[in-house]
């Protein structure tokens, strides 16, 4: 074992076709998604109970959501609230919002009316 694999033991858990150096290329999460779709389109991106969503499926679903947002008039710089639990639709929505240039405003479904009102005003949603 070399010093890198000794200090970064989690690397032994990665699939054999993954590169040990995972230095990010690109500037944002969308760049990383696009690159990952090119390299590993069939690999699992999300696991949710017994459902597995591949990177290709994640990209396609977030494209569809982005198109729906465009049809609703959402444009670059618009803030869009995501009022969802920790479920795949949150990730799909987040990427879809970013694809149209929107700003994601994540909101916890446990927030009460007073808290939601505060965040809606503060974020100009």
Q: What feature does the model see in each segment?
A:
Residues 2-8, 22-44, 60, 64:
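A short N-terminal helical cap/helix-turn-helix that marks the beginning
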Residues 109-125:
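Conserved ATP-dependent adenylate/AMP-binding module captured primarily in the ANL superfamily
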Residues 10-21:
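Short, contiguous pre-domain boundary segments
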Residues 101:
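Structured binding elements
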Residues 98:
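Anion (oxyanion) recognition and catalysis
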Residues 23-25, 42-87, 91-95, 112-117:
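Conserved AMP-binding/adenylate-forming core of the ANL superfamily
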């Amino acid at each position: 074992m070399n010093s890198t694999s000794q200090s970064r033991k989690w690397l032994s858990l990665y699939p054999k076709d993954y590169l040990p150096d995972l230095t990010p290329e690109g500037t944002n999460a969308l760049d990383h998604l696009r690159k990952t779709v090119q390299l590993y389109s069939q690999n699992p991106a999300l696991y949710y109970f017994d459902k597995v969503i591949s990177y290709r499926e994640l990209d396609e679903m977030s494209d569809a959501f982005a198109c729906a947002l465009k049809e609703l008039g959402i444009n670059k710089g618009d803030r869009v609230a995501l009022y969802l639990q920790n479920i795949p639709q949150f990730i799909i929505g987040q990427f879809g919002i970013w694809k149209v240039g929107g700003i994601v405003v994540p909101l916890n479904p446990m927030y009460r009316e007073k808290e939601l009102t505060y965040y809606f005003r503060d974020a100009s949603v």
